[in-house]
Amino acid sequence: LSKYLSVASGSHFQTNALDGVDQGMAAITLRGMDHASTLVLINKKRQTYAGTPSHEGEGYIDVNIIPEIALEQIEILKDGATSLYGSDAVAGVINFHTYHAFDGLRISASTQQTSNYDQEDRSLGMLYGGEAFDGKYVIAVSTLNRSPLNASEIPKIAELGLSGLGNSFKVTAADSLVSGPYAGSYSKNQTIPDPSCVSNGGVIAGPRCKFLYGERFNIVNDEDHLKGYLHFERSSAEIDYSMTLLMASVDVNDNPQSPSYP
C-alpha cells in the first residue's frame, strides 16, 4: 500500500533485481531520504534490521515480513520526530498496525499479470481469529509466487546494458595488413575493435566493441514468499498478557548476473 504514497519517494518495493544481496526485501523511506532516516515500527515497537544491508550499504527494516492480510492500518508521521524517537526518525515515522482481535475467517487471493509479457504474481492470504484460553488470538498466513521476467523479453531494455570499455586495442605505430581479420591500414594510436564483435554478440560503438550484458539480467526475479503472523492476548485483574510472533521466508530462485563487466 505504501508504494502509492507520494511521501514515500525513495523507497524500494518492487523486485530490486539489481540491488545486490537484498532481493525479495522491501524498504520504505519518507521524503526521499536514505533508509536510515525513517523509523519503521510494528505495533509501535522498534524492529531489528534486515540481515543484509541495502545496495547503498544502509541498514533498514524489511517490511516484507508482515503478511498483508494481517495489516489493519498504517500510520505515517511525515514530519521529523528526532526529539521523541531519536536520530533514526529524521524523515518521519511509519507504524504498521496489525490485527490484535479478529473473529472469523478471511481469505484473499489475487493474480497480477503483465499486459505484454509472460510474468505473473500469485498471492494467497488467510486471516483467522477467535477466542481461546480466556483470551483472543489472531493467525495470518500469506504466500506470494512470482514468476521471472528477463530483460531480453522487453524491447529496447536489454540493449541499454552495454559495457563502458569493450574489447578493443590501440596500435602504437602506423601499420597495414593485407589479409586476415584485421586487414586494413591503421594510423598511430588508432583504437581498433574486435573484428568478430558482432558475430560474437557484441555491439560496435565507434572504435570499440561493447559487451552486451543487459540480456543476462532479470527485470523480475523468480521468487517465493511465505509469511506468518500470530498474536495472542489475555487480560486479568492483575496483569495483561500479550504475545506476537512474525515469521517470513523469502526464496529467490534465480538471480542471473553478467559473467563480466569489461
Where are the regions that the model predicts?
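Surface-exposed beta-strand-turn/loop segments characteristic
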Residues: 3-25, 33-35, 45, 49-262
